[in-house]
Amino acid sequence: MSRVCQVTGKRPMVGNNRSHAKNATRRRFLPNLQNHRFWLENEKRFVQLRISTKGMRIIDKKGIEVVIAELRARGEKV
């Protein structure tokens, strides 16, 4: 499963670890992804999304029905 938020589109970034001596070694910064089930009242079923914590805040703000409608509008299967 890819490490991409279904709501925000956040994906891993690349950067450097920096030691005390300022040596640089490559590393990945991973998004804080969570598998979360949401209840859709109008469909009477649960939907499981792999979303970042920022995506959870967006769902709290807009509502799950609006976010699911946006996902379906851009062609994502939910």
Swiss-Prot record:
<keyword id="KW-0689">Ribosomal protein</keyword>
<keyword id="KW-0687">Ribonucleoprotein</keyword>
<dbReference type="InterPro" id="IPR034704">
    <property type="entry name" value="Ribosomal_bL28/bL31-like_sf"/>
</dbReference>
<dbReference type="GO" id="GO:0006412">
    <property type="term" value="P:translation"/>
</dbReference>
<dbReference type="InterPro" id="IPR001383">
    <property type="entry name" value="Ribosomal_bL28_bact-type"/>
</dbReference>
<dbReference type="Pfam" id="PF00830">
    <property type="entry name" value="Ribosomal_L28"/>
</dbReference>
<protein>
    <recommendedName>
        <fullName>Large ribosomal subunit protein bL28</fullName>
    </recommendedName>
</protein>
<dbReference type="InterPro" id="IPR026569">
    <property type="entry name" value="Ribosomal_bL28"/>
</dbReference>
<dbReference type="GO" id="GO:0022625">
    <property type="term" value="C:cytosolic large ribosomal subunit"/>
</dbReference>
<comment type="similarity">
    <text>Belongs to the bacterial ribosomal protein bL28 family.</text>
</comment>
<feature type="region of interest" description="Disordered">
    <location>
        <begin position="1"/>
        <end position="21"/>
    </location>
</feature>
<dbReference type="GO" id="GO:0003735">
    <property type="term" value="F:structural constituent of ribosome"/>
</dbReference>
<dbReference type="InterPro" id="IPR037147">
    <property type="entry name" value="Ribosomal_bL28_sf"/>
</dbReference>
